[in-house]
Amino acid sequence: MSPQIRVNKMGWRISTHSERSTNTDLMEGPTPRHSLLSGRYKQSFAYLTLRSRMPGIMQQVIMRVVNDLPMLEEKFGEEVRKDVKQIVDAIERLKMELNRDRQFLQFHGNEPDKAEWNAFLSELPRPKRTFFRACWLHAECYLYRRIFSFFENSRFLHNFDCFDHLKQEDLIISEETMKILAKATRDLPKTFDNFHKLLRINLWCNHFEIQLGAFTFTEEEPQNDINVLAKVADIDRVLLVNDSVLVWNCLMKPGPNGIVDYICDNGGFEFFADMVLLEYMVDNNLATQVRLHVKAIPWYISDLTRPDVEWTINYLVHHEDECLSALGKKWARLISSEKIVIAPVSHFWTGPQPYFVMVESDIELYRVLTNSRLAIFKGDLNYRKLMGDYIWDSAEEFITCLRGFRPTNICAMRTVKCEVVCGLPEGMADTLLRNDHTWMISGSYGVIQYTDSLKCSCAFPGEENNIKSEHWPALVQPRSGRSTGAQTPIG
């Protein structure tokens, strides 16, 4: 099908339909087990993302800069029109390259990480250097990196975040939910039960605002009750692996090092929920300091950057609601006193590499993580990088799938949104598939997984996977899992 072209108000020709690939060697069916996720397989979520979702995202970026042109002209003058036209043209070319499954191109501009990217691209086998034949992680990261490079190499818009309005709107529309969560979490006692509830709210926070809006409170269920909010967070959600006890016990162990590294995912309301959890940890001496690891550039639409952190705190500090304003001021104090800090920016987080190569490709970042008690990796993309975007057997141990990446104790919190998952009881994935064929991409299932940095990669029979039994009648009864360590909370 030929692309549909329209002429916008600036006289520029903009495609409104993606060109179809002329490739004939893409394969029917899902990505096979024991292989990297790839858009080569037409029944994979990777193929759907590359064929439909990414061209749509690029079109949205085009419309953002075109619609912002009057504001940009007011700020920079008429010369910014040239920047905008060049960016639009470059994104249109990138869409064409994607849909025709072209080879990845080297970076030749002002990108501070171009040497690392170009080395990585040069080392890829030639058959794995095109969008649909490459590992999905490589193709997707390359697309987002190329998109920002167009801004980065412009004269006026080198710091322009084409996604910031989406992150800010997500926080603004969640105002009522933020008020409820803020009031319910003031002065919570230091107990495992409260910590566990905050973890679950944090895990499901992308659904939480909608669920809370639809929930009918009884007289016995006040909105500012953390128990009720945790129940709301769990509505229609299933926690497949729950190592919360192990995470708590890790944080409760005595020792001089109480630093927690938090590898962030999204901005907006999710970052608000992150801060509620991290504030609780600092207030109750579960962490002496929390280091936030944010993205160096605009990334995956909603990922958190340093300007997003600053904007969020400033928005809360100046909010008209007294509770939210007080909360913003408290978080600002935690940051100024370095109880919560933004870690030095690393482009490794916006690179295409899985985390098990960090020790070779960014030894300084790896050393930073070794100096903490716990590293918490939040979200689906971080999980994919921990797993190497590889389809493991679903019952394979979490620690095995990390492939030697053990700078410190590790926790992964993630809602399942793609075919990469591990650490499930034997047979659970098959039963889930029979009952819900979308379970791997729906976001309705989640995991909180933990491994100790010194744990060996062997099975420990007879230990129970800590899964809530009431979730299981329609699925499968839980059997022995692979979590290790005491299943009783310390303290």
What role is predicted for each listed range?
Residues S2-I259, S444, Q449-G491:
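Non-catalytic accessory regions outside enzyme or core folds
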Residues P3-S38, V294-A296, D303-G491:
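C-terminal functional extensions of proteins
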Residues L48, L137, V241, F271-M275, ...:
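Conserved structured core elements
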Residues A134-H138, I263-F272, I297-W299, D380-K385:
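Gly/Ser/Thr-rich loops at beta-strand to alpha-helix junctions
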Residues I147, C264-G268, A296, R414-K417:
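Short, flexible loop/turn elements at secondary-structure junctions
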Residues I259, A287-R291, N409:
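Residues at the starts of beta-strands that form the adenosine-phosphate
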Residues I259-D261, R373-L374:
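Structural motif
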Residues F269-R291:
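Histidine-anchored nucleotide/phosphate-binding helix
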